[in-house]
């Protein structure tokens, strides 16, 4: 069996600190082992073949509806996180398949319009129920556990990708600001080093590509980059990326935690503050945020009043496992209706959300 040969190879080649595929804590619903893929390789494939993964190409990273083909979107961000985390994992002799699975799945629950969309959706959810929230890390886990459909080898469709514990935990803990999730420990860091690699790689990726895109958009110039960042990390973006990756590798070798040096940490914080001031808050993308709030708020309120308008979506949503008449059921259960509408809107691409608002407001456009 090819899988068993590969598992033996992992045991021989990977670090004692790596997470071996054969030692996975397994899946919520036990499955037969695949003859040629390890559990983590199988998870990579399940995520890449999912609809949620394909939709990432039409979701904003920072620049909403950018004029140009070379700006990052949520899919290219995901691929860059995967590339960085894989480089670090291989150098540290960690499990590259586990790293890759977490990386490709980490943003599956992201809303349209980037973090502006996430904030708008969170505010809208809280408007209806103050104790509810929308956070993309939790939604990413909800996507892989519940919302995404897959076809089993017997031809039957089921809800949820049924990923391994380690991949699910890595997805849930890839970002700061996470509420405790009942399935995982309350420690903010993933328990696997591979999960920690992805968490740090996510940060490295967005610092690198958000600056690159901001320079391309002429929002900032290379000369504007703070001196501390240049002195510590390098005088161009390519050099800075290499410095960060090498620093993670050097500082984390043979350690039970993935880390960076104090000097580099300070430089990264300075870089983030610079982007926040010049790009995230004080520039063109920020001006677009008001439009995002209007779009998300309009759609949310519209579907709270007209839940029957998404009847087709409801019949492909796991709510159908609870009731044969989801429209009537949700009209009686407002809390669940809020969650389902958040599921629906967060699954949208930027362009679909914009076109939807236009079609609702102007059903018969003047020709």
Where are these regions (language model features)?
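Short active-site segment of divalent metal-dependent hydrolases/proteases
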Residues: 105-113, 205
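Histidine-centered, transition-metal-coordinating active-site segments
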Residues: 1-78, 82-88, 95-96, 117, ...
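A glycine- and small-aliphatic-rich helix-loop capping segment at beta-alpha/alpha-beta transitions
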Residues: 114-127
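Active-site alpha-helix of zinc metalloproteases
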Residues: 101-102
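A generic membrane alpha-helix/interface feature
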Residues: 111, 124-125, 220, 367
């Amino acid at each position: 069996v090819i899988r068993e040969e590969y598992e033996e190879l992992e045991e021989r080649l990977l670090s004692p600190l790596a997470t071996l595929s054969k030692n996975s804590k397994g899946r919520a619903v036990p499955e037969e082992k695949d003859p040629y893929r390890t559990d983590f390789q199988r998870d990579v494939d399940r995520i890449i073949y999912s609809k949620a993964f394909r939709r990432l190409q039409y979701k904003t990273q920072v620049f909403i509806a950018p004029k140009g083909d070379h700006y990052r979107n949520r899919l290219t961000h995901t691929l860059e996180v995967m590339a960085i985390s894989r480089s670090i994992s291989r150098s540290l002799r960690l499990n590259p398949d586990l790293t890759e699975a977490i990386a490709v799945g980490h943003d599956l629950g992201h809303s349209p319009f980037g973090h502006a969309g996430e904030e708008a959706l969170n505010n809208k959810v809280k408007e209806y129920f103050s104790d509810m929230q929308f956070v993309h890390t939790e939604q990413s886990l909800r996507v892989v556990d519940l919302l995404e459909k897959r076809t089993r080898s017997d031809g039957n469709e089921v809800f949820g990708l049924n990923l391994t514990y380690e991949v699910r935990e890595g997805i849930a803990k890839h970002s700061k600001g996470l509420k405790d999730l009942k399935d995982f420990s309350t420690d903010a860091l993933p328990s696997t080093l591979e999960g920690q690699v992805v968490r740090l790689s996510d940060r490295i990726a967005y610092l690198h590509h958000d600056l690159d895109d901001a320079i391309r958009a002429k929002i900032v110039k290379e000369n504007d980059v703070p001196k501390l960042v240049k002195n510590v990390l390098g005088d161009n973006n390519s050099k800075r990326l290499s410095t960060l990756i090498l620093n993670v590798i050097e500082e984390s070798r043979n350690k039970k935690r993935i880390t960076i040096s104090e000097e580099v940490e300070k430089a990264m914080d300075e870089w983030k503050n610079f982007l926040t001031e010049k790009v995230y808050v004080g520039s063109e993308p920020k001006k677009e945020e008001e439009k995002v709030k209007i779009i998300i708020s309009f759609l949310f309120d519209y579907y709270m009043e007209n839940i029957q308008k998404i009847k087709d979506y409801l019949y492909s949503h796991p709510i159908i496992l609870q009731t044969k008449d989801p429209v009537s059921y949700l009209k009686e259960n407002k809390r669940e209706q809020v969650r389902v509408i958040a599921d629906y809107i967060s699954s949208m691409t930027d362009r679909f959300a914009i076109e939807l608002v236009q079609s609702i407001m102007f059903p018969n456009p003047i020709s």
